[in-house]
Regions:
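Short, well-ordered beta-strand segments in beta-rich or mixed alpha/beta enzyme
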Residues: 1-6, 35-64
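Residues in well-ordered beta-strands of folded domains
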Residues: 4, 87-89
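Short, surface-exposed ligand-recognition loops at beta-strand->loop->(often short) alpha-helix junctions
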Residues: 6-16
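An amphipathic, aromatic/His-enriched active-site/gating alpha helix that lines ligand/cofactor pockets
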Residues: 21-34, 53-87
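Short, low-order "capping/linker" segments at domain edges
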Residues: 89-98
Length: 98
């Protein structure tokens, strides 16, 4: 899953701080997340993109119901310029570490 956020002007640091407070610990403790990348857009000072690789579709749905995620969603909404753009992907090839 790829989630692209567009923050209100000059609010990206606030969104990042909220993500680090609410979601980073939850992601670290979530066995359903096989990988999670949180990235700041180099070309857009208000852009954030998260790449999430879940073990299963059920794990993704479970995470979206987690109390920390629901709290984050409520708190971050006023800081965003628009609703996040969500793309669901089916991994078809993954580079494995050797």
């Amino acid at each position: 899953m790829v989630v692209a956020h567009k923050t209100l002007p000059n609010r990206r640091d606030s969104v990042r701080a909220l993500w680090e407070k609410r979601l980073a610990p939850t992601v670290l403790d979530n066995p359903g997340h096989l990988a999670y990348y949180y990235g700041l857009d180099s070309d857009d000072p208000d852009g954030i993109t998260a790449f999430q690789h879940y073990r299963s579709a059920e794990d993704a749905l479970e995470f979206l119901r987690h109390p920390a995620y629901l709290a984050y969603e409520r708190e971050v909404a006023p800081l965003l310029a628009a609703a996040p753009e969500v793309r669901r992907l089916v991994p078809t090839w993954i580079k494995k570490e050797t």
